[in-house]
Structures are given as C-alpha cells and as structure tokens.
Amino acid sequence: VTIGRFRVRRLMRELGLVSKQPGSHAYKQATVERPDIPNRLNREFATEHPNQVWCGDITYVWAQGRWHYLAAVLDLHTRRVIGWAFSAKPDAELVIKALDMAYEQRGKPQQVLFHSDQGSQYASRLFRQRLWRYRMQQSMSRRGNCWDNSPMERLFRSLKSEWVPSTGYLTAQEAQRDISHYLMHRYNWIRQHQFNDGLPPAVAEEKLNPLSGMG
C-alpha cells in the first residue's frame, strides 16, 4: 500500500506521534562585511522583465545520514526557479553549478544583476570570475539582514514546510530527484504564488512574456 507524505503527516498528527528529527545544523555565516560588493538591489524586488535580477542562496537538507546543501537561483520577475544544484559540500562549485544551469537555460542573457547574501561562496574568486564571464553585475545583502534577500528565504521556507520530509531522505539521489520535482515542476508550474496574483511563476512568465523564459 502506497501512502503519500501528506497523509502520513495527518495520521501522525491525529495519533499524537512525532517523527525523529535530524540534529540541528551549524552553518558558518559570513562574519566580515564586504564593502566592495554593495547592496545594489536594495530590496527593489519588483522588476520590469525576466533576466533583469536573479537571486541566489544556499540551504541545507538532511539526506543519507548527513547534511547536504542546495543552491538555487530565482528570477525575480515572477519568482521562477531557473537553476539549482545539490552537493555534500557547501563550496563555491555548488553555487557556480546553480548559476551555470540558470545561464544556459535562460539563453545566456547579459547585464543581469545577481543578488545574494554575504556567504563566502558568493564572495569567492571563482564565483565572481563566473559572473564576470557572463557579464553580470553582483549585489550582496547587508551582513546579517535576511530581509535583503527575502524572496529566497520564502522559496526555501516553502520547500521545507510543504515538501521535504521532516526526517530527511534515505539517499542523496532520492533527495535530488524529489527536490528537482518540487522546484522545477510543482513550484514553477503548479503552486499558486501570491506575488503573481495566484499564478504559478512559470505560468505567469509565459502569460506576461510569451517569447521569453525557459521551456
């Protein structure tokens, strides 16, 4: 008998059962402000067209008995997920892979403003070189101010509260498949988004800009 995760959640709540949760995660945040990368976005989250501003961030997911890391890239125009990467290491290569995916799938646009927090991955020489190669401008949140990148915070909150099992995943491969399905299918094409007056991000983008975006 196959039982979906949402039914399991409801049954456990009715029976007063609590699942075993993974241990707390200690994620090293930036401790030094980076004045050389200003907050160019400055919470101007409304854009005029796709590929004007992209946002990126990293979160963590329990899989295969340890923490793994998810980097995602969001196009602010309709809050569409356009790139992601998953790895056991929260290094610069992780965020570069997510950026590469977004860049290729969006048709290699130029003059994009890329915004993130002050994580060391986004301030790394490797990542900044990739932005330079793609002719993108960089923007960073002020230190310790999550509201400067709130669209990414909301994306990850939705992923974890609506989709990721509370006990994590048995394997990293299962986590990648499941998270990919949520981000690129459910979140982009099915889930209603308040920012788009109830339209899913990909649907809103196609309606507003039928010749732009990803397939």
What residues fall within each predicted segment?
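Charged DNA-binding/catalytic regions of mobile-element recombinases
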Residues: 1-215
